[in-house]
Amino acid sequence: MRILLIGLLFISSLLSLQAQPKEEIRATWLTTLGGMDWPTRKANSAKGIEAQKNELIRQLDALKAANFNTVLFQTRLRGDVIYPSAIETFAESLTGHTGKNPGYDPLQFAIEECHKRGLELHAWLVCIPIGNKRQVTLLGKNCVVKKQPALCKQFNGSWYLDPGNPGTADYLSRIAKEITSRYDIDGIHLDYIRYPEQGEKFPDKDTYRKYGKKQELKQWRRDNITRIVARIYAEVKQLKPWVKVSSSPIGKF
């Protein structure tokens, strides 16, 4: 009986070890919207560029010292980005001016500095929100609201991509593919991949009539989000199977 008990405990221990993940993800978001985490200095000169770079280096050193191993680096903010893109324009937070080239590639620099420290970099993409009236005005002709207005809806004072329009999956997957194909990222992280708060009033009746196929509205909306995520996942994995795809969901939406 004692031998049997020891044997069962041994098997239980083995099963417990097998259930443990091979690698624990210890991640943090690094927010670039409004320079909330970075950058606090604008890249309007060689000195400003150097200050931006040094500030990021200090933050990454601190994360490494705190035993983090993954940085979720905000790469798409509100209809703008922090790398030279053929799809969207440079974010205001880099230089203080929307669309202005900062004189270097912040995403490439962040990837290189993360990898020097053994940190993974996952490109964090804010998916559905585009921005409020001021942000959209600053983006001007480069904004998706101007370039592809059929994809966009105004709701509660802000603009959003319409998840029910199949073109939204096309648009977001293009951004994810552009980043994945051009950069040595370790992951794509999807944020705000959902309808906005109070989304039951989202103005998508026309889209629902066109694409709903007599499906119940709430289920149709859930399926729209699932299709976008599945599309991005499949196309990222087709380009680079080792790149991880994750999201920041909120259960009540």
Task: Tell what function each PLM region has.
Residues 1-21:
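Bacterial Sec-dependent N-terminal signal peptides
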Residues 23-25, 31, 35-53, 123, ...:
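Active-site-adjacent "subsite" loops/lids of carbohydrate-active enzymes
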